[in-house]
Amino acid sequence: MSIQPGQVVTDPSDFAGTTIPELADLDSLLRCHICKDMLQTPVLTQCGHTFCSLCIREYLNKESRCPLCLAELRQNMLQKEFLVGELAACYMELRARLLETVRIPPKKVAEVVQNNSPIELDSDGEVEIIESCTGAVPGSKRGSPQVEEVEAAAKRQRTKQNGIQYMLQKKPKAVGEKVPCPICNRLYNKEFLERVHLDECLMMGTLRESGESDITVIEQQSYTAEPDSKNSHVAERRGESPVDEVVTHKESYLGSGLRVTKSRLPKLHFTSLSTSQLKQKLSELGLPTAGSRQQMINRYNHYELLWNSNFLDSIQPVGEGELRRSLLSWEATRNTDTPISSGVSSSITNMLKTNNSASTLLKSFKTDKFDKSAWSRLHGKEFRRLIRAAKKSMLEQDRGEAITAQNNELSTKASVDMESTSFRNDTNDTIDTVTDEVHEDLK
């Protein structure tokens, strides 16, 4: 991505002199390793690396390989990564405020210089930190009180360093200083690079072609696993982390293409395997062969999931011993005597053949091995009977309500008719009485 006029150029090193230098690692991970800018419209390769869509497509027009691991790559292999794109955009909106929040004020830097003992300060390192911090303060001028205070503290420190007592004191070694290998251009611990890696890299040829050996990785870890305790103590007093820990995730990502991956553990066709053959497969993987045949099938199926998820998808896979411990924990709660794997009789299906007591079914119902399909088959007749009874009850209720309404209507009509008949009878009686009276008067 080209830099536009007036665009502010950012870099992960902006966080180096802050209270949280590990943020430089996060900043690096959200950048495209082609344009070195923040990811824009990121896409994922089949080898697990992420680049800007435009950057990687332009690169693939010239070279059909991944820029990081040199694996074969074509444009039709790219996959969209919407989540990573939104994370990068969100981070860019917060980056300026985040950097301002974690930046160390010059006054605190001066206090660190005054309070630290000569044993805890390196001769050149502290002066460089002070100068970089004074230059990093926006809007600072040479004659400002803050800058003068920092310069005065640095001057006092240089005066201490000129004394004989300071010259006799043992200076600590630099922590986590990493330099690039002139052959493979990868960063290594300086001591490890000089003593081990250069000879090995010359013998193996270029690192990209041959891959890094297990011995190199183990020996490098031995050099970096125990940093100088005195420097670690100084870093803790300043509120910082040891330098070795700052770029761990970035290095893991960049070196992901060079890690040795194990082959996929295949699924087995258990119906064609005898029990002895199944035990042999488990023994080859270092897994126990105890239990029923179904338990052994469940054991292999779950270990196959653990294996492929760990060695094929993880950027930092654990060892096989850790996988076996996870399998043991799973077996303690899941792989009991009743089978649970798909394609075979489940726990409830097995109970249909052996024990259908209510207590046994209820016990199985309360566990996470509950099989809904088998439960439906077991109680299907009862469910259908209840449904029919409910429908019949509803029909009878509706019919009863209709009959009641009809009866009410008929009774209402009958009462009206009776009232009408009674009224007519009364009217006729009245007319007859009046007629009789009129006749008597006429006589």
Curated annotation (Swiss-Prot):
Residues 270-304 form the SAP domain. Pathway: Protein modification; protein ubiquitination. Its EC number is 2.3.2.27. Zn(2+) binds at C181, C184, H197, C201. Its main location: nucleus. GO terms for biological process: error-free postreplication DNA repair; error-free translesion synthesis; error-prone translesion synthesis; postreplication repair; protein monoubiquitination. Residues 410-443 are annotated as: Disordered. A zinc finger (RING-type) spans 32-70. Keywords: DNA damage, DNA repair, DNA-binding, Metal-binding, Nucleus, Transferase, Ubl conjugation pathway, Zinc, Zinc-finger. The keyword Chaperone does not apply. The keyword Metal-binding applies. It holds the Pfam family SAP. A zinc finger (UBZ4-type) spans 178-206. Interacts with E2 UBC2, forming a complex with ubiquitin ligase activity. NCBIfam families: rad18. E3 RING-finger protein, member of the UBC2/RAD6 epistasis group. Associates to the E2 ubiquitin conjugating enzyme UBC2/RAD6 to form the UBC2-RAD18 ubiquitin ligase complex involved in postreplicative repair (PRR) of damaged DNA. This is Postreplication repair E3 ubiquitin-protein ligase RAD18. The gene is RAD18.
